[in-house]
């Protein structure tokens, strides 16, 4: 049995986990910074770095203690090297290097996007429903929206990506525009079932070049224009006041300050994003002859996306991660390192953080 310590600090979560044999999560600890950044309406890179510095030592210590693991029990230390906020990446990477140097345990650098893919592979293998290859991976989060062909040897081919906003970024920006605070995506998801997803018709421009690419900036602008045309200042102010007085309103509180027209708008926006994601994912899967569809990243938490994917009767298995492994975590980083460990692909202590690291 081999254990890997994973460390993740690419954005605004400080995370550590111990995974055994690529499928057993012995511990997974995540320190969120949501309360820190929420008042600013988004992630502030400088604050994120400082919060990582405060959290990294206790988070790693807790992951080791929960799993009853000593450093000398580890086969490797895996750490996110990119993509992400460079200041945040440096905190986790520097600490992982220090542990590796002090303990003599080998270091493995991991691509954050690859980690999201392996979050699904880990759980599918553990649950006895392994992913069949080639697989089509849709990775959708606040910072990424990509389509990859995933081969059995864990090599990748990029098929499509966003040309502007990521899907999760579009959710959060629209949520902020409507007064739902940060992050706004989960609030839209909670309210969407109470609206009509066909009430507001959104159209997407035909993509020039790669038809599998995404673009969400036009949709975001269309929502802005709709808001400007419907005199929504008072209700938006009411929602902002609600968030100011209570950072975590319940559903009834949201519904009390959100008229039917805005519920329809939220439902229609979510429906449009989901349609774009699944339409391009299905086209990509058909192109490569996929035997599985992997949906991962923070947007994989969206209940509407999950329901639509499972209801679409695709001719291959659809795999989502559990909610705990959808958002940023370190178990996925450790899981992604196991194939590299098997190939003895260790990283040197000179490995650098890469804010714009690509997977393929």
From Swiss-Prot:
UniProt subcellular location: Cytoplasm
InterPro entries with a match to the protein in the record: ATPase_NBD (IPR043129), Gcp-like_dom (IPR000905), KAE1/TsaD (IPR017861), TsaD (IPR022450)
GO BP field: tRNA threonylcarbamoyladenosine modification
CDD domains attached to this UniProt entry: ASKHA_NBD_TsaD_bac
Transmembrane annotation, as ranges: none
Reactions performed catalytically: L-threonylcarbamoyladenylate + adenosine(37) in tRNA = N(6)-L-threonylcarbamoyladenosine(37) in tRNA + AMP + H(+)
Group of enzyme by EC: transferase
Pfam families tied to this protein: TsaD
Required cofactor names: Fe(2+)
GO molecular function, one term: iron ion binding
Keyword Cell membrane annotated: no
E.C. designation(s): 2.3.1.234
Binding residues annotated for Fe cation, in chain numbering: 112, 116, 328
A single Gene Ontology CC term: cytoplasm
Keywords associated with the record: Acyltransferase, Cytoplasm, Iron, Metal-binding, Transferase, tRNA processing
Entry's cofactor comment: Binds 1 Fe(2+) ion per subunit.
Binding site for substrate: 139-143, 172, 185, 189, 302
Disulfide bonds: none
Function as written in the Swiss-Prot or TrEMBL entry: Required for the formation of a threonylcarbamoyl group on adenosine at position 37 (t(6)A37) in tRNAs that read codons beginning with adenine. Is involved in the transfer of the threonylcarbamoyl moiety of threonylcarbamoyl-AMP (TC-AMP) to the N6 group of A37, together with TsaE and TsaB. TsaD likely plays a direct catalytic role in this reaction.
Assigned protein family: Belongs to the KAE1 / TsaD family.
Protein name: tRNA N6-adenosine threonylcarbamoyltransferase
